[in-house]
A protein has these predicted regions:
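Glycine-rich cofactor/substrate-binding loops
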Residues: 1-30, 34, 58, 72-77, ...
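A helix-coil-helix interface module used to build multimeric assemblies
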Residues: 1-199, 205-210, 273, 283-287
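Generic, well-ordered alpha-helical scaffold segments in large soluble proteins
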Residues: 37, 41, 87, 91, ...
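Short amphipathic alpha-helical segments with heptad-repeat character
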Residues: 119-126, 130, 137, 167-170, ...
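Acidic, glycine-rich loop-and-beta core segments that form the ion-binding/anion-interacting portion
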Residues: 208-296
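Short secondary-structure junctions and interdomain/linker hinges
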Residues: 45, 49, 63, 67, ...
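Core alpha/beta catalytic barrel or barrel-like domain that forms the active/cofactor pocket
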Residues: 99-107, 143-155, 183-199, 216-231, ...
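Alpha-helix capping and helix-loop boundary segments enriched in small/acidic/polar residues
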Residues: 26, 109, 153, 157-160, ...
Length: 352
């Protein structure tokens, strides 16, 4: 069997569009934007002449690092930034080049790159979520007046309209969609703390440099670094996991409706069986349940990654890198699978 996100299982559980936001290329491009913005900040406080800074900014943005060397060095350094900065410095010369990375630390780059990735993930997830809500609206318009048997505690209860169950699916999704603007604000924070989190290398220039970087990157400057306070990441992960759970609820319900037979639901497609060709397995529904449960388990690790010792934790950072992209990709996959599932429903409920 393939391990992790390799092999055929990527088609079941992966999301290429979201995975690309955490690729080497995306991360190193973010590093370049940070370093370029830092040069602009240093120029604003007079540490670099403006024309020299402008030249450096452009050259930094054009820099293409040796990814293989960075990967090899990261095993030794624990982070990709030291080798990235070494390579960058070797390519630059002239006035101001000695101040590349001045006042910053590796975590400033990796965290800010993650913030930029999460902003794009939120945009992708939000757009897909709005489409899914529209899909459910269309399903209700078509089948909402049909009748279903309510199920409470695994037993048949009273008759309900199909619209009642559809609303139960849709309402949590609408609430999550309404929270997107505040989530963007909470997640979109510049990370900039320097070596030990207090920007001491920049002295009285720290605030101006930080605000300049934030403005250049389109992020908010919270007034200080947050190396050991992971609220921006936890907020995003929590929203994504809550979304996965809402999708898992839909999958669980559809799977149980399929078990009850065509009186509850009929859909096109479905998975085949190697032993029983008569079967039409609700694979998309099963995927939603599995993805939701997986994200729930990953959230435990995200909470573990909140525990940083002293001013920085390499262990906590590594755990976060392992877990957070998976949460994003799992949620993205669930949104695609849920739209596929709802689109396959040909009838929900029986005639009243």
């Amino acid at each position: 069997m393939p391990g992790g996100q390799s092999g055929w299982i990527r088609g079941l559980t992966g999301d290429q569009e979201i995975a690309a936001r955490f690729s080497n290329q995306a991360q190193f491009e973010s590093f370049a934007r940070f370093e370029s913005a830092l040069i602009a900040g240093l120029a604003r406080v007079g540490l670099i002449e403006s024309q020299a800074a402008s030249d450096l900014e452009g050259r930094i943005l054009e820099f293409k690092p040796d990814e293989n060397r960075i990967a090899a060095a990261a095993v030794i350094d624990g982070v990709p930034v030291p080798e990235y900065v070494r390579q960058l410095r070797r390519t630059l010369s002239g006035p101001g080049s000695e101040l590349v990375h001045h006042g910053a630390t590796s975590q400033d780059l990796t965290d800010t790159a993650t913030v930029e990735a999460l902003r794009k993930v939120i945009d992708i997830a939000s757009a897909r979520l709005d489409l899914l809500i529209a899909d459910l609206d269309a399903l209700e318009a078509r089948d909402g007046n049909r009748t279903l048997k309510a199920i409470t505690r695994m037993q048949e209860a009273l008759d309900i309209q199909a619209s009642s169950r559809i609303r139960i699916w849709r309402d949590p999704l609408k609430a999550l969609s309404e929270r997107v603007p505040s989530l963007r604000l909470e997640t979109g924070k510049l990370q900039f703390g320097g070596a030990v989190g207090d920007l001491q290398a920049l002295g009285e220039n720290a605030e101006t440099v930080a605000v300049t970087i934030a403005d250049k990157l389109g992020l908010d400057w919270p007034g200080n670094g947050w190396h050991t306070t992971r609220r921006p990441f936890l907020a995003c992960a929590g929203w994504l996991s809550e979304l996965s759970a809402a999708l898992g609820k839909i999958g669980q319900d559809v799977a149980m409706m399929a078990l009850r037979g065509s009186v509850d639901i009929a859909f096109s497609g479905g998975g085949s069986s190697s032993a029983m060709p008569n079967k039409q397995n609700p694979v998309a529904a099963e995927r939603l349940v599995a993805l939701a449960r997986f994200n729930t388990s990953l959230m435990g690790a995200m909470h573990q990654a909140q525990i940083h010792e002293m001013e920085r934790s390499g262990a906590a950072m590594t755990l976060e890198w392992m877990v957070l992209p998976q949460i994003c990709e799992t949620t993205g996959c669930g949104l695609l699978a849920c739209r596929e599932l709802i689109g396959s429903v040909t009838r929900m409920g029986r005639e009243t």
